[in-house]
Amino acid sequence: MSALPFVRVRQHVNPLAQKYLTPANPLEWEKVYSSPHQPLHLDIGCARGRFVLQMAQVEPRWNFLGLEIREPLVIEANQFRSQLGLSNLHYLYCNANNSLQPLLSSLPTGILQRVTIQFPDPWFKTRHAKRRVVQPELVQDIANYLAVGGVVFLQSDMEFVAVEMCDRFAANPAFKKVGSGEWLSENPLPVATERETTTQNRGEPVYRALFERIS
């Protein structure tokens, strides 16, 4: 397998810019996955997609969908997936804040069983808070389509981002936080993101939480 060139892109993209306001079209799931009725893991803000790339190999009986707003990264990730011949993995260029409903509404009921949102752009300035990915509307979209018993895994190396994400899921009656402590000490998934590994290698904290859809 030949190596792909490393694509350079802007680190931060404003999701409220005009070019990102058009929602994604629904997918034809039977053309995307070889076994479209397997449980689906949705990774929101997948960046270069290495996390779900590894997950798709570790868990072949799951399907994986990575959403990313930076199109060059999606093109690169899908090329890499094709080289590996993975038929349970797909990447989609879209703005998750306006595309979840049209995407997920076409799924068979109960298929979406796991969602991850890991190390999203923090958008430090208060006036940019609406650019953060976890808005109440996104939480509701997930609640509408995640199977009962399905889970949402959140993590960040910025405590204020993790707190805000948790507060927004906790405010939705469809979700219940798993565990008694404020943060999970370990990642419950078998694969760590590159950002997670780098942060831990520096001896810095990662703030993690797990929510379950209960109703």
Swiss-Prot record:
Keywords, sorted A to Z: Methyltransferase, S-adenosyl-L-methionine, Transferase, tRNA processing
Pathway participation: tRNA modification; N(7)-methylguanine-tRNA biosynthesis
UniProt catalytic activity: guanosine(46) in tRNA + S-adenosyl-L-methionine = N(7)-methylguanosine(46) in tRNA + S-adenosyl-L-homocysteine
Catalytic machinery residues: 121
Gene Ontology CC terms: tRNA methyltransferase complex
Primary gene name: trmB
Domain of life, per lineage: Bacteria
Protein name as annotated: tRNA (guanine-N(7)-)-methyltransferase
Family, as annotated: Belongs to the class I-like SAM-binding methyltransferase superfamily. TrmB family.
Enzyme class: transferase
Binding site for S-adenosyl-L-methionine: 43, 68, 95, 121
EC identifiers of the protein: 2.1.1.33
Residues the entry annotates as binding substrate: 125, 157
Record GO terms (molecular function): tRNA (guanine(46)-N7)-methyltransferase activity
S-S pairs: none
PANTHER family registered for this protein in UniProt: 3-DEOXY-D-MANNO-OCTULOSONIC-ACID TRANSFERASE/TRNA GUANINE-N 7 - -METHYLTRANSFERASE, TRNA (GUANINE-N(7)-)-METHYLTRANSFERASE
Role: Catalyzes the formation of N(7)-methylguanine at position 46 (m7G46) in tRNA.
